[in-house]
């Protein structure tokens, strides 16, 4: 072995492999499913750790340079004196080297493929290690990098080993020629940018480094080199077959044994020699064989019933000794498209899916097992059954967990060229076919044995080109057991088995040039269109969003070929950063000084970065629930329908509860024994009491799982519904005797007094300016009309990110003058009545000399010390629909709790309230604020009948919010952690509130039904303060 490295570092850098799309690797081993090379059958069967694997994670030596040419030659032989330590796996940007960049479409480098900037941040990693002396004596020792972003060179003991790019698939090299007894030294030079970066333009943080596991694997000299497992099913799924195509690295007289296990018990086995059937006139393969093992009455795998077997593949010597064993979890299932429907095991699927980026707030793109399990448990608990690996192959452990817990997976190639113009510039260029091909073929070769993967995806947002057509054909030939999907190319793309648009709407066409997005209802009815439609992205959950999600699910359940979709997306991609005082906060694009950046567009999650749910997650849970209910109010019969396709209920109980104005009056439960796709009815006539008290009567039902499962705790609620029960009784409100309030007025004020209470209107503005109780003022600001909200991301659209969008709601409101309204009182008069005081006020709201709104109020102060407010608002025809119509003020009181009768307990809005349950709720004041990372309107509770907050008691039919943060602060503040509690409590009382929208976040997406587009609105409220003892 030469003591001098060859080629030299200078020679390697002169080749500029990282700017050559035809060069994706040097000396990298072929892709294959994950290997463990057990030497013991029982260990393989039981999935024990393998003694043939050595993990190299931990602290490595690290030196950072602004370009690869700055790396000194001596680093190949020994660490630099100023080297630091850096954890592997990690992203070096999160260790204060370089800056993470968040951008959606725009490339973070000048667009000139395949060239990348000369200033190309470079991380030089090294570490010492030793290996078992037996590994040096025999066999092959490999090093496996599960993920390195974006390209790297590898040396061992000063000798160049190889080069690789594609940041999301393993790079595996043979280290055997370079290893030595005692200490060995690895050196890895990682480049931030390479030509492959043009294929990795996903909507995510752009970070670098060795961010997945690094390990050594020792294989025997003669070893298994590839294993392909399929599970064909026959006779209406009553018979199955385990088929294993096994490859060996070199022709030999060895034999291979295939065994199938279930719960540790042997189901069947077969042993045979290598050698295939005759392929053509030149003969057969000597280095492979196919074993077929029949299985009677196999237990089928699905996301509902993720039954797994364990297959062991043992390489035997000619004498019958075990050379090595590989093992895989096996699920018997069949995926097909027939009659225009995607089916699993013969049943049409309804995809309850989400897109998921690999993201951790502290660790960036480093995934650990605990985070992966947490994500899966949350998905299962909230009725998700599918996940799209957006937009790259995930950590290999992810698929094993999805196999075991039960999630359908779309495995997606690491290809996105969204920032190219046109988008298909690279995908239609044969020069880029080798690079694209390796990203697809190596994904399939690594992941094909996982039952959870039901669809392959050719990538994301790369237009449509001839390269896609070639890759589609390759996948269909190599794996005919799964469909292929790809969104690019518009309505007529042939490179997909599934219509998988993003952000197509339920009823609204979006006729974009070349790539129209028809409404999903229309799409499945186009001439000669017979494919299923599954939205690859929909319901953009950016901040306070997700409005109209229920409309999609109404359509999915109504039209069989609308088979669901994948919500965008799972987790807010914010990173933890510390402010100047060392306090941590969640940072988004631009917070690291990164350019270009797309600010908060990375905050689209159903969960916060720490996996705390957004309110939208509950909306998804309710819409996607596997049990549907109907209630016949005439016969008082409840019917429950199971949407499980394969699972019989064996751990479900149906609970019912009758509530009068939120107070329980009767309850009961039934055992729920339902076959898949069946229903059962439960008569409640004999169980419901006769009630004569006034109030709203609600029937609540829920399905709970009494016993804990692999993914939920005991008594997990998995479905619910409720109905307002009709009542024929009418009740007159009781008469209340008491002294009438007294009126006094002068040129400046109108004052009303009742006992220990006093109210005051000021004539100059016509507002209720103060409310005293026992001479203590209760208001910090007057009670005023409110027609605006702190803009949501959906209100802003693409304004303030790339350009001003005149169609965005916030721009339309600005142009109309809604943020600079001048309020003018045109009427304020008061009258003493026999039983109270009446005040009538009228206000005009003007901008640029035009009257935009007119608000007329009638205030009745009664003998109970309460004030009833009747509000009428007229809206000018020229005004765009306002965000809200209501009243607001700043209360002096700060109370730790609020109680209300209405929809809750979590935040809800008029177009996102499917998951909000009518009842009597109590929550801490701080829980009424939803801490969206980018502040805006939040915390609303709709359809409220009564609100108790400290001494305040408010009745009517209204929406409310209570917050320590005022509207102006919410409008002006850029981050949640910068919000400062204000004096008192801000109270908003809305008679009407516009929806939040959510079909997407860059165009107006609030459905017409939830816009305040009328010309006149009326609402009523009753406010009272409790007498203090």
Swiss-Prot record:
Species of the source: Serratia proteamaculans (strain 568)
Annotated Mg(2+) 1 binding sites: 416, 418, 461
Family matches, as InterPro entries: B-gal_small/dom_5 (IPR004199), Bact_Beta-galactosidase (IPR050347), Beta-gal/glucu_dom_sf (IPR036156), Gal_mutarotase_sf_dom (IPR011013), Galactose-bd-like_sf (IPR008979), GH-type_carb-bd (IPR014718), Glyco_hydro_2 (IPR006101), Glyco_hydro_2_AS (IPR023232)
Protein name: Beta-galactosidase
Positions bound to substrate: 104, 203, 461, 537-540, 604, 1002
A single GO cellular-component term on record: beta-galactosidase complex
Reaction catalysis annotation: Hydrolysis of terminal non-reducing beta-D-galactose residues in beta-D-galactosides
PROSITE patterns, per database record: GLYCOSYL_HYDROL_F2_1, GLYCOSYL_HYDROL_F2_2
UniProt superkingdom: Bacteria
